Amino acid sequence: MLPLYVVNNYGQFNHLILRALRDLDIDAKLIPNTTPVSEVREGCQGIILGGGPDISRAGLSHEYVRLGKPVLGICLGLHVIAQEFGGTVQSGQKGGYGAVEVTITDHDGILQGYPQTMQVWASHADEVVTLPGDFDRLATSSICGNEAIAHKHLPIFGIQWHPEVSHTFEGHRVFENFFSICTGQNKG
């Protein structure tokens, strides 16, 4: 079985994504965001776009989104997905660093098994302000209107918070759910 690829977008927590996956016995590899598209297309069963400081440094991440693989975007990865499908990303009015309470509005896919509200760890200044037309909102908070999104027809998901950080309630579940989607056990 092919591994999941974790795309390093220079975020401070990207190595923790890899660690969280390995702790769940999920085969994964951290790759630079300059890895050739052909290598990503052939080498993995799913893609996790990690966070980072600036979307201009996201390398080939925008191209990875269009490979037909399941994709989970975390923080900056969410922004890449939103932009690629026509959404708008800009500086949030409140931003977020620290504990945030999110309200889940749709428990399918990557948020399956979570309670209605939960504490997560945020570390961002930008946010998705206009949701792309082919996406549904899965979660919201008082500081960010689009905390989690999912494509209506493709296995493409984005979350604003950091499930890889220990301060996020049961963050491992996002990775378990995404892996189940990648392996066909959960249709998302």
From Swiss-Prot:
Entries under CDD domains matching the protein: GATase1_GMP_Synthase
The reaction(s) this protein catalyses: XMP + L-glutamine + ATP + H2O = GMP + L-glutamate + AMP + diphosphate + 2 H(+)
Gene3D superfamilies on file: 3.40.50.880
Keywords attached to this entry: ATP-binding, Glutamine amidotransferase, GMP biosynthesis, Ligase, Nucleotide-binding, Purine biosynthesis
SUPFAM superfamilies: Class I glutamine amidotransferase-like
Alphabetized NCBIfam families for the sequence: guaA_Nterm (TIGR00888), PRK00758.1 (NF001975)
Subunit structure: Heterodimer composed of a glutamine amidotransferase subunit (A) and a GMP-binding subunit (B).
The protein's name: GMP synthase [glutamine-hydrolyzing] subunit A
